[in-house]
Regions:
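N-terminal, positively charged nucleic-acid-binding surface of large information/translation enzymes
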Residues: 2-272, 339-352, 357-372, 396-436, ...
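Secondary-structure capping and boundary motifs in well-ordered enzyme cores
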Residues: 49, 53-60, 70-74, 78, ...
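Structured ligand/cofactor/substrate-binding pocket environments in proteins
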Residues: 71-83, 90-92, 99-100, 165-168, ...
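Acidic, turn-prone loop/beta-hairpin segments
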Residues: 100, 189, 193, 199-207, ...
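Residues immediately within or flanking Cys/His clusters that coordinate Zn2+
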Residues: 189, 407, 478, 521, ...
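Short cysteine-rich clusters marking metal-coordination/redox-active sites
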Residues: 192, 410, 481, 524-527, ...
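Cys/His-coordinated zinc-binding microdomains
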Residues: 196, 469, 485, 528-529, ...
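C-terminal accessory/binding modules appended to enzymatic or scaffolding proteins
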Residues: 321-322, 886-921
Length: 931
C-alpha cells in the first residue's frame, strides 16, 4: 500500500534548527555578556592578535556624571564596530575606555549632596566627595557601555583623577610653561556668574535671548585738536552716539572707539549735534524713530577725533575717544562703547592707550560693585532695566529696540555668561599657531571638511584660558613669592609637584603648605626671597582630557603615540580634538592623532533636538528592553552618522523588521545545514551547480563591497550591502530556487547547495560580526564547525575577496538568466490572475528564443532551468511565440503543467505512479524514498 501523506512529509529534508525565529535579544544578550566576561573575551582577543600590526583608536573620555544617552550610545558603538572589525582585519586593536572625572558638574553635585554643610566643608573634604561621586558613575556607565556589546579594558580604564594621570598632566603643563606658552595675565574671559568661574570657548553654548538694544549719547567735554571749532560745531551741544545691547557694562565705559578709516558726520537734531558714522546715519535715525534731523557740514575722518574727551553718562569721570580696526559699519553707529574689562576687542584696543584704565565693576557673582556708583549691589541682569530707566529719564537714550539675539551661555548651568577681566592663566596660542596649522595638515580628516573647520577654529581663537576658580580638578602648579607676589614655575617645582601627585594624587596640594611641596633652595627670580604661597586655581578640564595623549597613549604599554584615530562628535572640534591638538603640538610639535573621524548629533524622528521637557527623547535602556542592543547597533550601522542621526520608536521598529530579514536568512541556512558536517560533506567546486557558483560569486561581490565600506568606516554601505544580499540575492532568489534540491533530494546536488550555503553563512556571519555582535555570535554557536574555527566569531579573520569571484562572462550569463527569470515571473503572475494556475509549480513554461537566447538557456540542464523558474517543466523552442518580453529574442508562454502532482515534491510530472509502491510520487521522489 502507498504510504500516507504524513509519512512522505517525514521523508523530506525540511529545515530543522534550534536557532529561533524570534530573536529574544533582551534575554539572550545578558547571557552572552556573562559568557564573554567569564571567559575574559577582550584580553583573550588581545592575546589572540598578539604580534599583529597595531591599530590604536584613542577613546575621548565621556564625563562621568550620569547615565548614557543615545548620543553616547552612537559614539561607543561606532568605536566598537571599528575595534571589532580591525581585530578581524589583521590588527591588534586594543580599546582602553576613559572617563573625564574632574570639573564643575561633579563639584556642584557634591555640594548639593552636603546641603547646608557646604559652608563649613573643607576643600579636601569636598574633593573626596567629588571623587566618590565620579567613581560611582564610572561603574554605572561602564556597565551601560558593556550592555551595548562594547568590548574593551573596562577593568583598567583611564581616569583623569588617577595620580599617575594627574602627574603626567602636570608635566605637560611644565613643558608648555618652559617653552613660554603658559602665562598669567589680566584679560577679559568668559565668566559664569552662577558657577563663579572662568570658562573656555569649548564650554560656551549659544542660545536665543531677548534684550534691549539702545543708542546712548555721551557729551563731549574736551576737544584738544579743535575739530569741532574747525567745523563750527559748539562743543557744549555735541555728543557721540554709541549703540549697545549690554546696558550693564556702561558703568565700565572708559572709551568710545571709532574707525580711523571711516567718515563721520555731525547730525543736528533740534539745536544739538550728534557724531556718528556717515554711512550709518539713516539706519540710526530710523532705529531711533527720528525723522527731523539734518546732516551738517562735510564728513570728517574718524582719525581726527582721536583723544577727544567726553563725560560719562552718569559717573563723575571722563572717557577717551580712541581708534580701532574692529569697528565696522555692519550695525550700530560706528562709535563703539568700549569697556576694557568686559570685552576682548575692548581690552585689546585699550592696551594701545596706556592712559585708559581697565575697569571691572562686577564681582565674581555677577553683582555690580561700588565702582558702578548708585547701582552697586544689583545683579548685572537686573541692573539693565534700572540703568536704562535712569538714562532714559536723563535724556541720554536716543532710541531703544527690544530684540532677540544669540547670546553665550554656560554649558553646565545653561545660564547667560558675561565677559569679565580677571587675572587668569592662559596658554598663548599665538606663539605656536603656525605649528598647529602644520600639524592639522598631517591629519586625515573624515569627513574632509574637518580640516577647514579645525584650521578656522585655531585661526580665529584667542589665547586659551586654562584656569578655573573651583576646587575639583588638577591644581595649577604655581607658587607665589610672599614678598613681591611674583609667580614661580621652574623645572624643579614641576618635578616636585608631579612626583608628589604621582605618589599621593592631587589632593596633596590641599594637604601641605607651599614650603612642604616646593624644593629647598628655590628663590624668587625677582626679589630673591624664599617664602611661598600656592596658587588656588585648578586647570580647565579640557586641559585634563587634552593631556590623554601623554598620560594614556605614552604611558599604557599596549598603546602608542600618536593614535591612529580619534573619533568623537562634531562638538569636539572646539573640545577634545582641539585641546589634544594644542597640548600635543605645544609639548611635542606634532598632532596626537593620524586621523580624526567625526559623527553628528542624535535628533528625533522629525530632525529636532531631543529634550526631556519636549518628551521627544528616547533612552538606550528603553530600546534594549524592547528590542535588544543589537537593534541599537543596527541603527548605528544603518545611519549616515557623519550628519545628524534620527532616532525614535518608529525607526527602531522598522529596523527590527530589517533585522528579522537578516536573521531569517541565517535561520533558513542553519535549518538546511542540519546534519551537515563541513569536515566531510563539502563537495568540490566542480560538483557545484551553476546557480551555486552564482551564489558564491554574489557572496564575493558582498565581500568586496563590505570590505570597501569598513575600510572607510562607511557602515551604512556595509548594512545596505548585507541587507540587499540577504533579501534580494538570498531570500528572494537563491534560497527559494534551491528548496526542491534541499528538501527532496539526498545526493550530490543537495550537498552542493549545502556547501555553498555553508560558505555563504560563515562569511556573512563574519561580515556582520562587528555590527551585530550578539546575533553573529549566536549564529556562530549554531554553525557546524571545522577544527580551524574559533569559539568566538570576533577571533576570526574577515573574509577576503577573490576566493569565490566569477569572471565577467559568467556574471553576464547569469545577469541574462535572471532577466529571463524575471520575465517568466511576469507571465506566471498573469496566468495566476487568469486562474490558469495557482502556485508556480503548477505551470509549464515554453520559452521562444532566438539563437543567442536558446544557446544561453540550453547551457543549463532542463531540470535546473525549471528549478530556476520554480516551475514543473520548461521547454525551449527556437523561433517567435508567446508574450513579448523585455529580453531581446525571448517570448514566454505559460500553461498548466501536464501530468499529475507529486505528493512529495508538488511538481507535476508524467511519471507519477511509475513505482508501484508509491503511486502518488514521481519517479525521482520514489527513488529517494526507497533509498
Amino acid at each position: 500500500m502507498a504510504k500516507n501523506k504524513s509519512q512522505y512529509d517525514s521523508t523530506l529534508n525540511l529545515p530543522k534548527t534550534l536557532f529561533e525565529m524570534r530573536a529574544g535579544l533582551p534575554k539572550k544578550e545578558p547571557v552572552m555578556l556573562k559568557d564573554w566576561d567569564d571567559n575574559d573575551l577582550y584580553n583573550q582577543l588581545m592575546k589572540h592578535n598578539e604580534g599583529k600590526p597595531q591599530f590604536i583608536l584613542h577613546d575621548g573620555p565621556p564625563y562621568a556624571n550620569g547615565n548614557i544617552h543615545m548620543g553616547t550610545a552612537l559614539n561607543k558603538i561606532i568605536k566598537d564596530i571599528i575595534i571589532r572589525e580591525k581585530n578581524m582585519e589583521g590588527f591588534q586593536a586594543p580599546y582602553v575606555p576613559g572617563f573625564d572625572t574632574h570639573g564643575l558638574p561633579i563639584e556642584l553635585k557634591a555640594l548639593s549632596s552636603v546641603g547646608e554643610k557646604k559652608k563649613d566643608i573643607s576643600k579636601l573634604e569636598l574633593r573626596q566627595i567629588c571623587e566618590k561621586f565620579a567613581t560611582e558613575h564610572i561603574d554605572i556607565m561602564s556597565d551601560q557601555f558593556k550592555r551595548l556589546g562594547v568590548i574593551g579594558d573596562f577593568e583598567h580604564p583611564y581616569l583623569t583623577l588617577k595620580p599617575e594621570f594627574e602627574a603626567r598632566q602636570i608635566e605637560i603643563f611644565g613643558e608648555m610653561a618652559k617653552k613660554g606658552y603658559i602665562y598669567k595675565g589680566l584679560k577679559p574671559v568668559y565668566w559664569c556668574p552662577d558657577c563663579r568661574t572662568a570658562l573656555a570657548e569649548a564650554e560656551i553654548e549659544y542660545g536665543e535671548d531677548e534684550c534691549d538694544s539702545i543708542f546712548v549719547r555721551f557729551h563731549v567735554s574736551q576737544d584738544p585738536n579743535g575739530v569741532l571749532a574747525k567745523h563750527g560745531i559748539p562743543m557744549e551741544k555735541t555728543y557721540f552716539v554709541i549703540w549697545t545691547t549690554t546696558t550693564w557694562t556702561l558703568p565700565a565705559n572708559e572709551a568710545i572707539c571709532l574707525n580711523g578709516q571711516f567718515e563721520y558726520s555731525f547730525v543736528k537734531i533740534g539745536d544739538e549735534f550728534h557724531i556718528m558714522a556717515t554711512d550709518l546715519v539713516k539706519s540710526v535715525m530710523d532705529s531711533c524713530h527720528i525723522t527731523e534731523y539734518e546732516v551738517v557740514g562735510e564728513p570728517v575722518s574718524g582719525a581726527e577725533f582721536e583723544l577727544m574727551r567726553y563725560n560719562h553718562v552718569y559717573l563723575p569721570k571722563e572717557g577717551w575717544v580712541i581708534l580701532g580696526d574692529h569697528v565696522t559699519l555692519e550695525s550700530g553707529s560706528g562709535c563703539v562703547h568700549t569697556a576694557g574689562g568686559h570685552g576682548v576687542d575692548d581690552f585689546n584696543v585699550c592696551q594701545k592707550y596706556p592712559q585708559i584704565p581697565i575697569t571691572v565693576p562686577v564681582d565674581d557673582g555677577g553683582y555690580l560693585t561700588e565702582q558702578a556708583g548708585k547701582y552697586a549691589g544689583q545683579r548685572v541682569w537686573a541692573s539693565n532695566k534700572t540703568i536704562l530707566a535712569d538714562l532714559t529719564a536723563s535724556g541720554a537714550v536716543m532710541g531703544q529696540l527690544h530684540i532677540k539675539h544669540q547670546y553665550p551661555h554656560c554649558w553646565r548651568c545653561h545660564n547667560p555668561i558675561i565677559f569679565r577681566a580677571t587675572e587668569q592663566w592662559f596658554c598663548s596660542i599665538a606663539k605656536f599657531r603656525e605649528d598647529v596649522y602644520k600639524a592639522i595638515d598631517t591629519v586625515t580628516w573624515m569627513p574632509d571638511w574637518g580640516h577647514d573647520r579645525m584650521h578656522g577654529m585655531v585661526r580665529d581663537r584667542n589665547d586659551w584660558c586654562i584656569s578655573r576658580q573651583r576646587t575639583w580638578g588638577v591644581p595649577i602648579p604655581a607658587f607665589y613669592c610672599k614678598k613681591c607676589g611674583a609667580y614661580h614655575i621652574t623645572d624643579a617645582t614641576i618635578k616636585a609637584v608631579s612626583d608628589l601627585f604621582r605618589k599621593e594624587g592631587s589632593d596633596a596640594w590641599y594637604k601641605y603648605d607651599a614650603e612642604q611641596i616646593i624644593p629647598a633652595g628655590e628663590v624668587c627670580e625677582k626679589c630673591g626671597a624664599s617664602e611661598w604661597t600656592k596658587d588656588t586655581d585648578i586647570m580647565d578640564v579640557w586641559f585634563d582630557s587634552g593631556s590623554t595623549h601623554a598620560a594614556v597613549l605614552e604611558e599604557r604599554p599596549e598603546l602608542r603615540f600618536p593614535a591612529d584615530m580619534d573619533m568623537e562628535g562634531g562638538d569636539q572640534f572646539r573640545g577634545w580634538f582641539q585641546s589634544s591638538l594644542l597640548t600635543s603640538v605645544a609639548s611635542k610639535g606634532c598632532a596626537p592623532y593620524k586621523s580624526v573621524l567625526c559623527h553628528g548629533w542624535v535628533v528625533d524622528e522629525q530632525g529636532k533636538q531631543m529634550h526631556k521637557s519636549a518628551g521627544n527623547g528616547v533612552e538606550p535602556s528603553e530600546i534594549i528592553k524592547d528590542y535588544g542592543a543589537d537593534i541599537i547597533r543596527l541603527w548605528v550601522a544603518s545611519s549616515d552618522y557623519t550628519v545628524d542621526v534620527r532616532a525614535g520608536k518608529n525607526i527602531f521598529k522598522q529596523l527590527s523588521e530589517a533585522y528579522r530579514k537578516i536573521r531569517n536568512t541565517a535561520r533558513f541556512i542553519l535549518g538546511n545545514l542540519d546534519g551537515f558536517d563541513p569536515n566531510t560533506d563539502c563537495v568540490a567546486d566542480d560538483q557545484l551547480q551553476d546557480i551555486d557558483r552564482w551564489a558564491l560569486a554574489a557572496l564575493d561581490d558582498l565581500i568586496v563591497n563590505t570590505n570597501a565600506g569598513y575600510a572607510v568606516y562607511d557602515f551604512n554601505k556595509v548594512y545596505h550591502a548585507v541587507y540587499n544580499f540577504c533579501v534580494v540575492a538570498m531570500s528572494n532568489f537563491y534560497l527559494d530556487v534551491t528548496k526542491d534540491r534541499l528538501y527532496c533530494t539526498n545526493g550530490t546536488g543537495r550537498k552542493a547547495a549545502q556547501t555553498a550555503m555553508y560558505k555563504i553563512l560563515v562569511a556573512l556571519d563574519k561580515i556582520i560580526a562587528p555590527i551585530l555582535c550578539f546575533t553573529s555570535q549566536e549564529i556562530w554557536d549554531f554553525l557546524p564547525k571545522t577544527e580551524a574555527m574559533n569559539k568566538y566569531v570576533v577571533f576570526e579573520d574577515m573574509p577576503k575577496a577573490g576566493q569565490y569571484a566569477a569572471d565577467d562572462a559568467f556574471k553576464a550569463k547569469w545577469a541574462q538568466l535572471i532577466a529571463v527569470r524575471d520575465e517568466v515571473k511576469k507571465v506566471l503572475e498573469q496566468a495566476r490572475a487568469d486562474k490558469q494556475i495557482g502556485a508556480s509549480l503548477e505551470a509549464s513554461v515554453t520559452l521562444y528564443c532566438n539563437d543567442a537566447v536558446y544557446d544561453l538557456l540550453n547551457s543549463i540542464p532542463m531540470d535546473e532551468l525549471a528549478d530556476l523558474m520554480i516551475v514543473s517543466h520548461v521547454e525551449l523552442v527556437k523561433g517567435e511565440g508567446g508574450a513579448a518580453s523585455a529580453v531581446e529574442g525571448l517570448g514566454v508562454a505559460a500553461a498548466h503543467a501536464t501530468g499529475d502532482k507529486c505528493e512529495r515534491c508538488w511538481k507535476y510530472s508524467a511519471d507519477i505512479g511509475t513505482h508501484a509502491a508509491h503511486p502518488t510520487l514521481c519517479a525521482r521522489c520514489a527513488a529517494v524514498v526507497e533509498g
